[in-house]
């Protein structure tokens, strides 16, 4: 199979047409009257919304903007600006009260205080994986980092129980958003449009029954860098194009690369393609100017994440 640095270049005009046809077919097949989409202020939701408008028209696409008190303020700002560019109707709902009622922040903070007893409302927190996978080998252990707002940062490696507690609480943000999306979708008899791309799907970078709980996934076949190609072609606003991708679920801001992927998307996607299609190691090294050890290190990371997240990509098992 062929492999070169431009292997992921796509014909954007044809791809948009193909995705539009898919969206139209699904709306008809499922007898819905339009599309409902969560707008995060990121590139995936911006591209998805824009293509939905091309497929169905602006009057058949409704956007929900669902910030909470720890969201980056620019997320809502950019989502609103993109929606205005598309001329679609939106509604903004602060989900903080729902999260507080469930105990999202309290449950997470209780776990954090087991590591850092001083942690209170004046602090911010995030979790990250070891940086720069290409430069050094490291296990996928998560580190908790807290900032006191005075320039002081502390960090500690997380054990399994502590990590699970933080992730379980944080993932409730995604699941709360999906609850709101489906409420409005059922009211309007609309489909919920997902925004997860192929890079995220393969590596398990989504939340089961959260952002992964949708009716259609029009970007699931595209790597993240291909989504950016479509974004440029469609004319997504510059603020979103230039923004570093982020899960935007932690009070202490963190990028996708810091939190999970450990290498830039441009490198990640090419290596992921090579791993997925079993491109010979020597060819990958020559094309990307990497050593065999670097490529092996990254593919070990791919395999570990893929295997650990298989359940996210599967339907619930049944007897028959």
Task: Please tell me what each predicted stretch does.
Residues 1-37, 51-54, 59-62, 70, ...:
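ATP/NTP-dependent adenylation/nucleotidyl-transfer catalytic domains that generate, transfer
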